[in-house]
A protein has these predicted regions:
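Extracellular beta-sheet/turn segments enriched in Thr/Pro/Gly and aliphatic residues
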Residues: 44-86, 93-97, 190-212
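Tryptophan-paired
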Residues: 1-38, 89-93, 97-201
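A surface-exposed, glycine/aromatic-enriched loop/edge motif typical of exported proteins
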Residues: 36-46
Length: 212
């Protein structure tokens, strides 16, 4: 697919000549940043609270950010900036190894990161708690899960962890009923084979959950 391109004109803004950085922010509501700094170091310290993503149907206007860094000659009227999402997308696929066994299947994203730096940073924020998303029903109590996966999608601020601290990892909790009993399982999201549990901004991750 072609890369989306937005051509827009900003009036009343003069680009400073010389080497500099032009920062562009999209889909950020008025008032989310109390005061915009006029220097790059101040811009790099800005943190955006994206806790509102915990509720469903609020993921269509996630914040975008990009920047141009280089020489700006006198008379320059246009620069090209590539925008990326401040969040990562989690694609959760839930299915059963054998159809007709599991019912009342629910999932919940837990210990999710809700804040992130606006400018890409080598310093990362740890989850502060309160990052549990609303529990979501995958299939109700009156139906059974089949072998064809059912998908749920989440957006989350990036959670970059060293992997050694399990308390910083984002988890997916799954609840399901089987044979009249309810079972609960929590899975740390990431690459367990290489002990990498980081979920980085502007990336898509797919997790296939198969109930047995």
């Amino acid at each position: 697919l072609p890369t989306p391109v937005l051509n827009t004109t900003l009036e009343g803004i003069a680009l400073r000549t010389g080497r500099g950085t032009v920062c562009v922010v999209g889909n950020l509501a008025d008032g989310e940043i109390a005061a915009w700094p006029d220097n790059l170091s101040g811009f790099k310290s800005l943190v955006v609270d994206m806790g509102w993503l915990k509720e469903r149907n609020t993921d269509r206007n996630v914040c975008l950010f990009g920047y141009y860094e280089g020489e700006i000659a006198a008379g320059t009227t246009a620069v090209n900036v590539v925008l990326g999402r401040l969040v990562c997308r989690l694609n959760i696929a839930v299915s059963a190894k054998t159809a007709g066994i599991f019912s009342n299947v629910r999932i919940q994203l837990q210990n999710a990161q809700t804040k992130g730096y606006l400018f890409p940073s080598d310093v990362y924020l740890s989850p502060e708690g309160g990052g549990d998303y609303t529990e979501e029903v995958v299939i109700g109590a009156d139906k059974v899960l089949g072998i064809a996966p059912l998908y749920r999608y989440y957006y989350m601020a990036e959670n970059v962890t060293e992997g050694t601290d399990s308390g910083e990892r984002t988890r997916l909790q799954i609840k399901a009923k089987k044979g009249g009993a309810e079972y609960t399982k929590a899975i740390d999201l990431g690459r367990s084979d290489i002990h990498d549990y980081s979920l980085r901004r502007n990336n898509n991750y797919t997790f296939n959950i198969v109930l047995e």
